[in-house]
Amino acid sequence: MTFNELNIAEPILRAVCEKGYNEPTPIQEQAIPVVLRGKDIFGIAQTGTGKTAAFAIPILQHLLKKNEQNIAAEPASTNEPGRARRNRRGRSHGKKEYRAIRALILTPTRELALQINDCFTDYGKYTGLRHTAIFGGVKQHPQTEKLRQGVDILIATPGRLLDLIGQDEVRLESLTHFVLDEADRMLDMG
């Protein structure tokens, strides 16, 4: 099987091919079609087998498709996504939310958060979708600024996520996709 046979959207397929990947790994071949059908999965595979792509590619596909549907549904005179007015803390002052977080990937360490963020950069570079990683051990301000600009996909460690939810910097009411990466490791950490 090839990535082309998985019916991946052209912008994502182009990015995957640019990375030099033609054939999915076993976890990708098993997981991607299931997630693309909107089903939940529980995946276990060794390190280095492509687990991140197994969830990143279908998430990108779903969000890209939803964006295309939203654009097609807008009146012809306003074919740009509406931007709600926001106050200094990034809160919306209009009826329409702009770039609400729709996917959350929770991971135990900053190193994993950065690796996952890099994968979304690589596979999503032609989609127009925005993503960022938030994690502790660094100043919050640069991370909250990225959040205020709007992100579709958030990669986070539990501690920083809880901090920013408590400060009303992260809102998850528009979430459609949730991934626990390395869930066993997070449970071991408490």
What label would you give each PLM region?
Residues D168-E169, M189-G190:
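Short, conserved "post-DEAD/DEAH" coupling segment immediately C-terminal to helicase motif II
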Residues E5, E10-R14, E18-Y21, I71-G166, ...:
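Conserved nucleic-acid-binding Ia/Ib motif block in the N-terminal RecA-like helicase ATPase lobe
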Residues M1-I44, A54, Q61, D181:
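Conserved pre-motif I regulatory segment
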Residues P58-K66:
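Conserved structural elements of the adenylate-forming
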Residues T49-T52:
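Conserved lysine of the Walker
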